[in-house]
Amino acid sequence: MVYFKTLLDGNSSLGEILAHRYETWSSRMVIEAVLIPLVHCPLLWKILDIVIFTSLPVLLCGLLGVTGRGRWFVTGLVLLYPFADMASAGWIATTTNYLWPLWGVLVIGMVLKQLRCGRKVPVWEAAAAFLACAYAGSQEQAAVLLLLLLGMEVLHYISEKRMKQPLLYALCGIDIISLIYIFSCPGNAIRSAQEMAGRMPEFADFTFAEKLYMGLANVE
């Protein structure tokens, strides 16, 4: 987090910093466009993070249709998460890179549920879904998760012959653009090579199945 705090201390603008990060380290420009200013305003981050974390069980209950005492169960499950893990790379950096994209995926899930139920999505909710998709899609794992989620929704409406879903297609477009951006980012390739050389040089020789297993397994 100290690193991000020093980025705006020089003469470079936020746009120049993000462009440099894109070329040399990361494609998470939407996330970092939020992260870097928030590092200089920790009070605002605290307010936003509290709102996001406390709304997680609300979103989960809404998605799963949980009511009554079941809401307390879902809330308890959320509270079981060892939140100290969010300090691994600094509180602001870790939450904005991992917790907030998860929240964005849940927001999109709620909007998709409304579409499934045939309800009209208000303009402000559609706008929130677009912002959530752009933000969550900036994080690699969340972008892939959204692709699967949105893809399944498209197949569902195709099977039901309900093809007029402009909001869904717009979300798909945002996520696909995000994925193209991720895969074409030179900084991601540079970071991957540096991390591999410094942490696990033999990783390049692993099979796809071995890499997939390592990605899914707990390697603590």
Question: Where are these predicted regions, by residue range?
Answer:
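Structural signal for the C-terminal ends of transmembrane alpha-helices
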Residues: 59-67, 81-84, 108-118, 151-163
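Transmembrane-helix motifs of polytopic, lipid-linked glycan transferases
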Residues: 47-72, 107
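Transmembrane catalytic cores of multi-pass membrane glycosyltransferases
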Residues: 1-44, 52, 92, 133, ...
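Short hydrophobic alpha-helices at membrane interfaces in multi-pass membrane enzymes
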Residues: 114-134, 163-169
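Hydrophobic core segments of transmembrane alpha-helices in multi-pass, intramembrane catalytic enzymes
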Residues: 49, 53, 97-108, 145-153
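Membrane-interface micro-motifs in multi-pass membrane enzymes
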Residues: 24, 28, 71, 75-113
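Central hydrophobic cores of alpha-helical transmembrane segments
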Residues: 71-78, 125-132, 169-175
